[in-house]
């Protein structure tokens, strides 16, 4: 793995080498020209845009939008202007959707129109345009999605039980010895993916497999932020800036170097998975008919993209721990259900899911109460559409304000209260954590199955408490949140085995559990073959 401090030193040198005057004049010229071109185009529109707060010439609402937790301000505005609202962020027309009804009308019922992405210049440069998360809607994106779906169909993810069983048993055994739950979650999530994709279990929190992949993703993120602070923000607002000469765009060299590291890592992993002596995702996607015309590199990205997405599961599990620690009376109700259905003589199993409605409600309420992705990921409208007398123009960026959906008092009374019971009283409550339409999370079924069994076993095994006082307000609003994601701040928790019998059972189950990757994958393959 390459030395990130050296990279960032070089990045600073690249940025400092740009003449501020030259860059400023170039930016101003492109910005003003683009503004008047868009202005002349919008003047031809016959329908009005949805209402929204008034902005300033050239910059629109950019300086009215808070840098931290903008979804709360968007909800405040939507309460005034309605569930379909227009913002002007630089040169970008952004439509904010703030109700389940509107989100379903547009993102589900007209999914094809709203399944594209805006031009994410920095993001796509960092991946050479091969990360399906940033692709425009079209054949290439559909091909990548087909390969991902080939290993993530609902019936297939249910057959990964043998691996989930082993990984969650190791998780429980680890938490008997340490309260460092974040590291334990990191290992388990990475191992689930690495085993299925490439045939290699991750057995220790400090395993080189974790460090290497995590470092790569971290450096990508930090480099993206560093260049964003230099010229990246401007290039996202004004994509034409990417075509300026290289001496005015030093961030491109950095993106290309990071992309090379991703390329090598993903291809090396794909080859390992193909050569593994057992069934793997790498083998499955490589032999798929859709993959035949693709390069090896492109096929490798279909799995590499899933790895990056899987990292959010760590944060979701941390939310489960947080609510269990903050609301012990709710965790106790979940434990009552587990004791009645499962007892103390065995671990909860996947087959118990239909008999554990409170566990299901506990998970759904946790993800509603503390959404990890309050603004989801941006979409783009591929053509002009009329909706309720307003124009949603072609090329507009569409954001679903998940925070507004989850904190709508008409749908979720007392939204700041953690109330799993609401899902028992009304099983038809809208649950949209994993997105809408064709562009929703490709791994939603795998994530839900893994999250359910992990939560059931954690609550069956442990009484979870905060190790030091935690303010709920601090957990809901992360001051270091990004533009779209909001991981919860760090906090400490303790895990005490509920009784000696459960502790002994955890130790025994982990002692006799299969730990060799290929043996586990052969069990998975048997399950898949029997279904087929």
UniProtKB/Swiss-Prot annotation:
Quick one: which pathway? Secondary metabolite biosynthesis; Alkaloid biosynthesis
Q: Which membrane topology describes this protein?
A: Single-pass membrane protein
EC numbers listed for it are 1.-.-.-
SUPFAM superfamilies tied to this protein? Cytochrome P450
Enzyme superclass (EC): oxidoreductase
State the function annotated in the UniProt record: Cytochrome P450 monooxygenase; part of the gene cluster that mediates the biosynthesis of echinulin family alkaloid. The pathway begins with the biosynthesis of the cyclic dipeptide cyclo-L-Trp-L-Ala (cyclo-TA) by the NRPS criC via condensation of L-alanine and L-tryptophan. The prenyltransferase criA then catalyzes the first prenylation step, a reverse prenylation reaction at C2, to yield preechinulin. Preechinulin is the substrate of the cytochrome P450 monooxygenase criE that catalyzes the formation of the double bond between C10 and C11 to produce neoechulin A.
Name of the protein described by the UniProt record: Cytochrome P450 monooxygenase criE
Q: Which organism is it from?
A: Aspergillus cristatus
What are the leading ranks of the lineage?
A: Eukaryota, Fungi, Dikarya, Ascomycota, Pezizomycotina
